[in-house]
Amino acid sequence: MNPQFIVYACPTGELAKQLETYWQLSREQCGANSAHNYMPHCTLTGFFYDRPDSASYYLQALEEAYKSAQNDLSLEIEIVNLVFNSDWHGLELQAQGVKELVRNFAQIETSPTRTEEIRLKDWLHLSLAYGFAPEKRSHLKQLAQKAIDVQANVGWELRFYQRANTVWECLRTWTL
């Protein structure tokens, strides 16, 4: 079976440390939820399948889109809000320049073996918790409010991942 590929923006710095602490505490105190299946990230594309040897096409296109964006766009990711809905907790994000970078990547990418379009994500967010038992909502909210400071120092990396079965491999990172 062909591997899946995906493009993420992942936090670094103090916020990343706070998110790791939250991940650990929420798992220990409330049990695993669907967010625990992934590292803290903002999804920029949907998963797409292609042959393992096609990764070079995507890496080349991302490199080209990144270099172009560095010259023309702001690649800042802004945390807009910490949100606690009944079935989803997370950070809502804004990043028009990053969205444009990924749109450019999808347009210039040339893999001859991919059979589906690369789906771009419009709603940018970082999930803290979802798929949790309703009775855990309040405790998860309290943990997040205590552990996460949305004003904390944060950097972001653009990352291209390959996932085969359950094994993730980051093939390349770029500093945003």
How should these model regions be labeled?
Residues 1-76, 95-157, 167-176:
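Basic, often amphipathic N-terminal segments
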Residues 81-87, 156-169:
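Glycine-rich beta-strand-turn "strand-cap" elements at beta-sheet edges
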Residues 90-94:
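Short histidine-centered catalytic/ligand-binding loop motif
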